A protein has these predicted regions:
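Thiamine diphosphate
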Residues: 1-117, 120-217
């Protein structure tokens, strides 16, 4: 057991990671991850760089994030806009159960730190309860998913905004084949090949996210 102190949770995980363990820890709400920023920014993210690849800091930090649960200011924050700019850390942000399992299993097998964001608005939602391909399913990082195909506009999104984007398209009652939706699945690395191939077709892109407008993802 660990104390409900984010700096201690991540700091303990750092010590375990550099001594051969693979810790999987949870920050109860992304809103409180900031007290662990010294450990994440200066220790976890820089371990490989500072040691010239002699040391790594493999761990998985699970972080529930996002709004839509009436959690007010301390239980609704989105943190992807910050962490996507932080080098040295992989970021997963699934939109459904199958992707969550495949990405989490892959994260546990990687030799680098992973921040695994879980949108609270997806918990216990029927539309997020997807079937897994098989019990050994692994989903590689950096491989997005083409949700629906279209040739007029590309929507690039992730997490809970995938469903919100699909609902918006349905609400507008647009003909099929106009809107293309891409679910990134991971924010670091990003599937640039999938994005580029879609934009070559549509020539227009809309990024849908839940973080700050200024300096967001």
């Amino acid at each position: 057991n660990s104390p409900l102190a984010e700096s201690s949770i991540v700091g303990t995980a750092v010590g375990m990671a550099v001594t051969g363990y693979k810790p999987v820890v949870e920050i109860q709400f992304g809103d409180y991850i900031w007290t662990a920023m010294m450990q994440i920014r200066n220790e976890v993210a820089t371990m490989r760089y500072r040691s010239n690849n002699a040391w790594t800091c493999p761990m998985v930090i699970r972080v529930p994030v996002g709004g839509y649960i009436h959690g007010a200011l301390c239980h609704s924050q989105s943190i992807d806009g910050y962490f996507i700019h932080l080098p040295g850390i992989y970021i997963a942000y699934p939109s459904c159960a199958a992707d969550a399992k495949g990405l989490l299993k892959m994260a546990c097998r990687m030799d680098d730190p992973v921040i695994f964001m879980e949108h609270k608005g997806l918990y216990r939602q029927g539309y997020a309860a997807t079937e897994e391909p098989d019990s050994d399913y692994l989903l590689p990082f950096g491989k997005g998913r083409l949700v629906i195909e279209g040739d007029e506009l590309t929507i690039v999104t992730w997490g809970a905004m995938v469903q919100k984007s699909m609902e918006a398209v349905q609400l507008l009652n647009l003909p099929d084949g106009l809107i293309e939706i891409i679910d990134l699945r991971t924010l670091n690395p990003i599937d640039l090949d999938l994005i580029e191939s879609s934009i070559e077709k549509t020539s227009k892109v809309l990024v849908v996210h839940e973080d700050n407008i200024t300096n967001g993802p």
